[in-house]
């Protein structure tokens, strides 16, 4: 399992992946908004999305787990 974590404090603007999706390395999983900038959260490797631990509009902290890949 691989945990994809937030690299900064921000809010979840849009989630583009869902549980069960097969993703490739560097696929965009979600977009965070921080200080009026959009930051793409990408898959660090290919795999299957097991769990998305946030929802749109959630405020996330640096280091918070956003997505779990199989």
Predicted region positions:
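Short beta-strand-turn/beta-hairpin segments enriched in glycine/proline and small hydrophobics
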Residues: 1-11, 28-44
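Short histidine-centered loop motifs in beta-beta connectors
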Residues: 8, 14-18, 22, 51-54
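Surface-exposed, flexible loop/turn segments at secondary-structure boundaries
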Residues: 20, 37, 57
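Short hydrophobic beta/alpha edge segments that flank linear recognition/processing sites
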Residues: 24-39, 61-70
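PDZ-domain C-terminal substructure recognizer with occasional recognition of PDZ-binding tails
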Residues: 47, 52, 58-66
